[in-house]
Amino acid sequence: MGIIFYTTQMPNFEQNQVIAVGLSGGVDSSVAALVLKEKGYEVIGLFMQNWETDSKDPFCTAEQDLSDAKAIADHIGIPLYVVNFSKAYWNHVFQHCLDEFAQGRTPNPDVWCNREIKFKSLLDHAKKLGATHLATGHYACIQNENNEYRLLKSNDSHKDQSYFLHLLNQYQLANSVFPIGGYQKSEVRAIAKKRGFINHAKKDSTGICFIGERKFKDFLNEFLLAQPGNIETSEGKIIGKHDGIMFYTVGQRKGLHIGGRPDAGEAPWYVVDKDVKRNVLIVVQGYEHPLLYSQELTCTNLHWIRDTEPSFPLTCKAKTRCRQADQTCVVTRLDNDHCHVQFEHPQRAITRGQSVVFYLGNECLGGGIIN
C-alpha cells in the first residue's frame, strides 16, 4: 500500500530541506516521519525528555517510548537525537499547573506544553540542527494565505487536536508542519502496520502527560499539601468530607464517597463548584441538575492566532473541552484581556482553568482560559 499524500495540507518545500520530526515513540509521529521521508525530504528525529523519572518507576513509559522511537528511526532510516527539556517543562508547564491546582482550578498542561515546549524549545532546537521546519504527529492542518497562517481542524473529527494547539502564534505555525493532518487515524494505523512498524497497535497516550497511569491524587500529593474539608450541598448542608479540593473538578462523580445516604434519593452526586476560600466542595444530585449547566462564561489570557483579532461581537463556535461538539456562541470583548461568551444553549460542567477555544467553520481562531 502506497501512502496517499494529502498535498493540500503540506507546504511546498524544497526536497533538500531538512525537516525535524518530534518522534515520541507513538504511531502518529512515526507515520508523520515516514510521510516526509517518502516525499523526499531530509528528515531528522527528535525525542523529548520532559520529565526526570526513576527508570524503575512502573508508571513511566519514557524508557519504552524512547526504545520505540529508536526502532522507528532505524526502520525509516533517519537519525534520532534525544533532547532534555525537563527544566523548561518544570518551569513553564508543571509549575503553572501546580499553581492552578492550588487555586482550585483545573489546568490543561497539553495546551501549555505545545506553546512552551514542543513549538518553542523543540522548534528552537530543530533550527539549531539546521532544520527549516518542525513536524509533529498532531491531527490538525496549517494553511498559508498570503503569508498569514491559519490553524485548521484535522480531517479526522474524532482525533482533531486543534483545541490543544490554539495558543500557537504565527511564527510557530509558519515553521511547523502536520504531515498526518489530512489522514484518518485508521489510515495512520494501516500505514504503520503495512510498513511493519512495531508500534502500529500501540495505544494512544491519555490523561495528564507527567502523571501517566498513576493515580492523580497520589501524584499531586507529592507536590501540594492537601487540606481536607467539608462537602456541602448547594443548599449548604454538610454531607461529607473531601481530601482536598485540588483533587476534584466540576462535573466529577467518582471519588466523592457520599452515595447511599438515607436522607437523599438514589441519583448520583456531582461536583458543581469549589469554594476555595472556605475550602468547601459543593455538590448537587443528578446528572441533569440545572446548577451543572451554564449559558455563559468569562475568559482571560486571550490569544488570537491571526495577527489581526476578529471584530466583536463575534458570532462563532466554541469548545470548552476537547471532545465536545462545536457550540454556537457570541463573544463580546470586555477589556484588553477578558471576553464574555454567551452560548446559544446551556453547557454542562464549564470548568475554571480549562480552555475555551473559538472556531469559524474549520478554522481555529484562538481562545482563552475560563475563569
Swiss-Prot record:
Gene3D superfamilies in UniProt: Adenine nucleotide alpha hydrolases-like domains (2.30.30.280), HUPs (3.40.50.620), Translation factors (2.40.30.10)
Site for Interaction with tRNA, residues: 138, 354
Localization, UniProt: Cytoplasm
Catalysis: reaction(s): S-sulfanyl-L-cysteinyl-[protein] + uridine(34) in tRNA + AH2 + ATP = 2-thiouridine(34) in tRNA + L-cysteinyl-[protein] + A + AMP + diphosphate + H(+)
Pfam families per record: tRNA_Me_trans, tRNA_Me_trans_C, tRNA_Me_trans_M
Residues of the active site: 113, 209
Record protein name field: tRNA-specific 2-thiouridylase MnmA
Organism: Coxiella burnetii (strain CbuG_Q212) (Coxiella burnetii (strain Q212))
